[in-house]
Amino acid sequence: RSKSWNVFLFLYLALPLFAQKEYKIDQVSVVNVGDGRLLFQELKTEKALNGEHRIIDGYHSAYVLASFKDGFYDGGYKEYVDNILITEGSYKEGRKDGLFKINSKFDGKLKEEKSYKEGKLDGTSKSYFTTGKVESERNFRMGKEHGKQLSYESDGTLRKEHNYKDGKQVGKQYTFLKGTYDLYETVYFNEEGFQDGEYSSVFTFGSPRILGSYKNGKKNGRWTTFAESGDTLMIETYLDGKEDGLHVSFANGSGVRQKEYYMKNDRKDGLYREYNLENGELRYEATYQAGRLHGKERRLIVSNRFDYWETSTYVNGRQNGPFEARYVKNDQLRECGEYKNGHRVGRWKRYTIDGKLEKEWDEN
């Protein structure tokens, strides 16, 4: 009787092994039925797979151990590479359903966890560092990000905290940015998923790097950029996402005004000036209209003899009209003539600093 019992027990334990059938990958046809599901059939008979089967990809030392129903994944699912379990989860009627675990193909350590419902991400998904600490955490509701999105440094320091609702960013978004400067960035999103409200990026020691604001996803109002020292580097003005108004930039370290001009619809419009970085004195001045030079342009020319100002006339971006150059020292005329479509034309004259005619010629 004992011998009969042992035989029965052996057959009972061995049943799953006999029930499980192995297929090589080229013995199975896989059809995408169009709704994200895969239909598995025996290649020769075209019969849908049912029960637990092992599908082997001998070329890559990989295989899948999964349960099937009417040709679709249904039940437990495991994927191996070089006998290391790299994916484990479950399906329901061909769709991922429940917790999926993704492991490293090198050492089998847990890399990711994802929760599914009816084939869509639903619940908390996590990724892990090789140490086992959480690297990131995201929350979903039926395929759309919903809730907090968190990411961490390997030492556990929070790097990102974003908030989502039905797939859109909403509310306060915090990010730790690493680059030339390490910065803490904070921006706000409205219920429609657009940036809206105050924006700031701040140095790790607490001083601001950039301060500004958004309105319905577009930059709006004054934006200011600062140096690590706290000095202002740039002031910009925006309207509906386009630069519109005064733009001023300053030299880092000295704080000397470098450039100032006006913008309209992202194009220079109005007075434009540049300054000497050493002493802050004006060295260039022009007028723009709709992004093109239009009107007078003055440019300081520094010479090893005598510095002088050149004054040109522009019409719709082309140099047209009278030209003159005057010495800085005594405002005496240095050179005069005329331009037409960017070329010198007509009679030109040049004078010495004491007012004597030095040269006179014609330009073709």
Locate each region found by the language model.
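Glycine/tyrosine- and acidic-biased, solvent-exposed loop/turn segments at the edges of beta-strands
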Residues: F18-N364
